[in-house]
Amino acid sequence: MKFKSYFKSLQFSSKALLVLLQLVFIISTLSSCASDKNEERSHLVFRYNEHSNISSLDPAFARDQRNIWATNQLFNGLVQLDDALKIKPDIAKSWDIVDSTCTYYFTLRDDVYFHKNKAFGKDSTRKVTARDFEYSFNRLTDSKVASPGSWVMSNVELVKAENDSVLKILMKNSFPSFLGMLGMRYFSVVPKEAVDFYGNEFRRNPVGTGPFQFKLWEENVKLVFRKNKHYFETDTQGNRLPYLEAVAITFLPDKQSEFLQFTQGKIDFISGLDNSYKDEIITTTGQLQTKYKNSVTLSTTPFLNTEYLGFFMNTESQEIQSVALRQAINYGFDRNKMVKYLRNGMGIPAVNGFIPKGLPGFDAIEGYDYNPEKARELLAQYKTETGDNQPEISIGTNSQYLDICEYIQRELEKIGINVTIDVMPPSTLRQMKSGGELPIFRASWIADYPDAENYLSLFYSENFTPNGPNYTHYKNETFDSLYVVAQKISNIDDRKHLYTKMDSIVTAEAPVVPLFYDMAVRFVSKKVSGLGINPQNFLVLKKVKKEH
């Protein structure tokens, strides 16, 4: 009996084992199929990384690059800028400007719909009208919203929907740059129903009109957008955009880890140049290293970003108050060598004023080339005028630009200027810079819109911080009068002459030390096509394709 019982037990165990093996085989097969399916569809998903969390997907808060990149996939405005920064129609199919750039009439397309969402009730969506733009623009000025972009409406007197398809905008004063400004993400159209439905949570439940629509967001982990199958734009062959099925964003804070993900094919591109990997991927002359030439495309273009040191002019410091010493600092270091060795050639030495290359108003004005002899002469002049034989300055910066500040420190000490460097977190640097607490600060200015006026606004005396971007508190009556006149001139060539004069005034008085005009740099997987590059470093994914 015991033998029979044992035999039955063994027989049962064998059957159980067989069933178990079959289950394992089925599961592994299904898993393999799922993996194969994911692999087959991976070419339909564009993946990139952000180093810090996106704070909001509400375009009213599209203040910095990470928010702008994300919202650029979800929303549209009246106009858009192409890669050459030319103004093109977006939801507005045409426009008329009357009264010397004081009144605008925009005629809208009639085939644009908001993303499907429960906020619209049983219809799930509806057509965009001029009233939506009226609501969206006026929302920027609502103190309850507290949009950091409220300033873009400061010169707007009235926004009114004439009817469903015509929007009128009346300016307080002539402002020729306004049409280009409308390409900013702040000026996106949003539906009132969705803003009311989600309230403060609209920031993480965005509803727009863009080529992609919101799918899910696990903050600081991942963010996913899906294709908007009803998007209104088509390519030149009439194919509906976008080509991709989805966009996936990760949030790795470490740039070296991001680079590793890129080399492993887990993300599709990286933007910018970081010290942690720059020598690994490019040569000292700014070319791709040989090992990456078959898998990576390097794209560069002048970036509308000027990197600089700023002097806070409203101070009693005799070093800061001395034009001679400020000029000596400008002459006292070699920008060409700095860009070549610290940026691997990725940048343009800022020896021609503050306005960067690529903007109307940029001209090869005489700036500050490296001239240590001239710097010593100006330093001697400073000593004679002040009796101070040991000038000392302190530069506030964050760690990302420490190498550049240390280079300037070494070069200036060679000519007799003692330099200390105060390294602080980026948030502290921004706060102290805005509060006038730093005698000298490292900063950058990226164009909000493609007009040189945007850079010159940093020196207009009505724009002192915290009410504007004049962080240096520089004031010059001649500059101010030219700035006001330029706002009334619609012809860009006529404005350009005034811009050049203003840039020359700033250069001569040296409230800033321009370091370099930046380059937009992108390393893109060879599997990706259709990803352009532009001087504002916008991320436009609607025409991107990926190979298997």
Predicted regions and their residues:
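Ligand-site clamp/hinge motif
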Residues: N200-R203, Y231-T284, N418-T420
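Ligand/substrate-recognition segments at binding pockets and active sites
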Residues: I348, A380-A447, A520
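Gly/Pro-rich hinge or "lid" segments in bacterial periplasmic/extracellular proteins
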Residues: F175-P242, A246, Q256-S257, E373-E377
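Surface-exposed binding/hinge segments that line
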Residues: D96, D132, V145-K192, Q213-E218
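Alpha-helical secondary-structure segments
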Residues: T129-E134, G210-P211, L241-A246, Q264, ...
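Structural transition elements
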Residues: F212, I348-Y382, Y401-D403
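N-terminal lobe/hinge region of extracytoplasmic solute-binding protein
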Residues: N49-D99, N138, V207
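Extracytoplasmic/peripheral linker and loop segments enriched in polar/acidic and small residues
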Residues: V339, T420-L429, S457-S525, H548
